[in-house]
Amino acid sequence: MNAKITSPGIYTISHADYHADPCPTPSLSSSVAKVLLRQSPAHAAMQHPKLNNNYVNAESSRFDLGTIAHALLLEDDSSRLITIEADDWRTKAAKEARDAARAEGKIPILVKQAAHLLKMVGTARDFLRDSEVGDMTFKPEQTLAWQEGTTWCRARPDWLSTDRTLILDYKTTDDANPEAFIRQIGRMSYDLQS
């Protein structure tokens, strides 16, 4: 970890440094809060990089599409994306290519997923441009650090307006039906993140 936070503020740090917890003492993030609320303090400690020496950030492959969509939309960064020329992951060659990409720290997606991904990101960009926030300026992936008493807290909103009056949070979903998305908000505890 390269970044160290020593006082409350807004910081520009890497994704990896944020998830390694750059605060002076173990800090509370939305991920830790979810575990505290759903399970227990002991479970939260096991999933905290400063409280568990054996902690490994195991990003689930089920979030790959959302992770890449965020990187493309927020930072115009495709460096972690590798497109695999295969119809699915069932062949030996596709599995080997997928595993090699993961070993390099990349996120592999299939060609058909790449087309869907680019359409998704394009739609989000069009929506932002044409919406009420289209004239505002935002900084992506800023790290916010503050203290509540003696407890350090941190957050990493997708977009923070430069005048600090608005935070936007980009979410991907399997079902755009409003009722289904409301259920997803509860299931994924999005209310703790935003």
Could you tell me what each predicted segment is?
Residues 1-155:
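Metal-dependent nuclease catalytic cores that hydrolyze phosphodiester bonds in DNA/RNA
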Residues 138-194:
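Mg2+/Mn2+-dependent nuclease catalytic core
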